[in-house]
Amino acid sequence: FFFLMIRRPPRSTLFPYTTLFRSQVIQKLYEASIGGVQVELIVRGICGLRAGVEGISENITVRSIVGRQLEHSRIFWFANGGEQQLYLSSADWMPRNLNDRVELFFPVESEEHIKRIKEILDLYLRDNVGAHMMQSNGTYRRVTNKATPVSAQSSLYEEALLAAAADKIPMEVRLRPMYSKDSKE
């Protein structure tokens, strides 16, 4: 399914990962790039793909955003022939997750949720504080520009704090684990 979706025009896709290392997935992304698909990846950790290589991956960009939080986004946005589709997944696309575990990959159908997730993705694409872009030689260069600083993680963290304060949730409750070894539940 995933491999069919990345080939449908208009040709653009966006995927945030923690890790991208599976050779079959990387090969299909290369094939999509060669076919003219614009692929934007946000890969926080290990990335076995090489972006921006002429004739192979010039239509692929890889950005890494490292900040205060360790995130595990698994969002897949497909332009899908003009009918945009958004999916969420429970796994990074590493062999151990795809071969040895039961994982979920499901569509987001609520327009309200789609809108919110796209706002978050846009925020990550505008990040110019913790973002680094992969160069064609595999190294990363920090995103620098003179625009107003944008930190996706800080913005989302502050938004969550404001929402919790508006709900008048005490700090000790907000930061307490729901389950611990001492839980009665």
Task: Outline where the language-model segments fall.
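Short, small-residue-biased leader/transition segments that mark boundaries at the very start
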Residues: 5-20
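PLD/PLD-like phosphodiesterase catalytic module centered on the HKD motif
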Residues: 18-185
